[in-house]
Amino acid sequence: MSETGGSIDSREEFKPTPAGQYKYWNEELTASKKMLNSFHRQGTEVVQRFLGGNVRREDDNFSSNIFRLNLFHSNITTLQSLMYSNLPSVTVMRANNDPKDDVGRVAANILERILTNDIQCNGEEYDTVLRADLQDRLIPGLGCSKVRYNCEVCEDEMGMEYVKDEAAPVEYVHWQDVCWGWSRTFKDIPWIGFRSYMKKDEVVARWGEDVAKALEYKKQTATDPQEDIEMDGDDGPWQVAEIWEIWDRTKKQVVWYTKGYSKVLETKEDFLGLSGFFPCAPFLLANCTTTLYLPRSDFHMAQDLYNEIDELQTRISVITQAVKVVGVYDAGSDEVGRMFEEGMD
């Protein structure tokens, strides 16, 4: 560690033991959360604004306005419809369209049919993930999903193992449940962590009773507990443990970590063998530059315009409510009296 603390001079400072690796990943995750803190705070505020809530401004108390023309919601809804409506179709083509390459032509047709059938059989799942990723990109500014490999291995009569069933489902990852190491581009990211929540029974089945007793459990909330913004009734009913699945590209390992435990829960060597190592594609990031691989929502790029529209709407509404018809009239003129009364509404 450096003298200032909170920084890493060399990875060799941490012993290659579960306890030593826990200290290392605790430092990495702490630094990553600090880097993402402002984005998470702004993202939560933008989500609230999309749902009709208020977004705080530094220059004045804009949250006191009660009249709102939520063009941001209308804009995002329109963009979602324009950018995605149906599942994409699969097309597999040969790199070289040689006229006598029957093997390549047939292989391309087979692959296209296999992939098309996979999408059709899991169409609802893919559709849900794609819509969620797009919404996260357009509102807070970060869309992410990952692939999980499931494999069921059985033994035959001779005791030989064989793969009975295997699948690679696509999983949506909430924009607050992913973090990564400091970098300027996705290509340079040293590691990516995915957060999940496990019930005590699930922890027992995965790591045993002793580990389950030592973990901290709390109710899952819709927003990050570290943020000041809270939503009424956003707590889940279950007590769950916060588990981070960290894909370390530097060491080609996958580590399971939870804060407060004395060591990492588990470490595995790369079991997927993907060319890019990570089980996810590059994130859908809004307004990211090469200065730092960090998103910033589209709303903050145009928030002055949205706020100005709301201010004008507030002034119009206040003036409209203040305008009324006054005067004197003959008590016998019922029509005139009704006009004055209706003019007050």
Predicted ranges, named:
Residues D234-D345:
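Extended, charged amphipathic alpha-helical segments
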Residues M1-E266, E341:
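Extended, helix-rich architectural segments
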